[in-house]
């Protein structure tokens, strides 16, 4: 009998492998992305102190969204997290794609964050 691999379990393994090499510092924190079926979340994290510096998601009330699980929503979340990070004085980050492929919503969020002023 053939068993189908759980995509989320393989993503978590992939993320753990990447996280073993990636750490965010106060000077260059980690931009983490989490993608669910309904929403997308982004956090700028200082791993040394264990502190989330900035966050944004499609659940934020100040973002005017038509849908929460599309590329346009991911773009707005990327712009929002980048603006909030620049306001806090963070210009450079390490991008953590969370084990997801750099494609679609994850790519849209990353490119929007770059255009809004974050460097990675």
Swiss-Prot record:
The keyword rRNA-binding applies. GO terms for molecular function: 5S rRNA binding; structural constituent of ribosome. InterPro entries: Ribosomal_uL18_bac-type, Ribosomal_uL18_bac/euk. Pfam families: Ribosomal_L18p. Keywords: Ribonucleoprotein, Ribosomal protein, RNA-binding, rRNA-binding. One of its GO terms (cellular component) is cytosolic large ribosomal subunit. One of its GO terms (biological process) is translation. This is one of the proteins that bind and probably mediate the attachment of the 5S RNA into the large ribosomal subunit, where it forms part of the central protuberance. Part of the 50S ribosomal subunit; part of the 5S rRNA/L5/L18/L25 subcomplex. Contacts the 5S and 23S rRNAs. HAMAP family: Ribosomal_uL18_B. Belongs to the universal ribosomal protein uL18 family. This is Large ribosomal subunit protein uL18. It comes from Bacillus cereus (strain ATCC 14579 / DSM 31 / CCUG 7414 / JCM 2152 / NBRC 15305 / NCIMB 9373 / NCTC 2599 / NRRL B-3711). The lineage of its organism: Bacteria, Bacillati, Bacillota, Bacilli, Bacillales. The gene is rplR.
């Amino acid at each position: 009998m053939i068993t189908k691999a759980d995509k989320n379990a393989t993503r978590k393994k992939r993320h753990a492998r990447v996280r073993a090499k990636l750490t965010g510092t106060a000077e260059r924190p980690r931009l983490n992305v989490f993608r669910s079926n309904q929403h997308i979340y982004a956090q700028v994290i200082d791993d040394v102190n264990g502190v989330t510096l900035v966050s944004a998601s499609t659940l934020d009330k100040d973002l005017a969204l038509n849908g929460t699980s599309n590329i346009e929503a991911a773009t707005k979340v990327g712009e929002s997290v980048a603006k909030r990070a620049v306001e806090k004085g963070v210009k450079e980050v390490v991008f953590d794609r969370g084990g997801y492929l750099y494609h679609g919503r994850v790519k849209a969020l990353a490119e929007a964050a770059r255009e809004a002023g974050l460097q990675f």
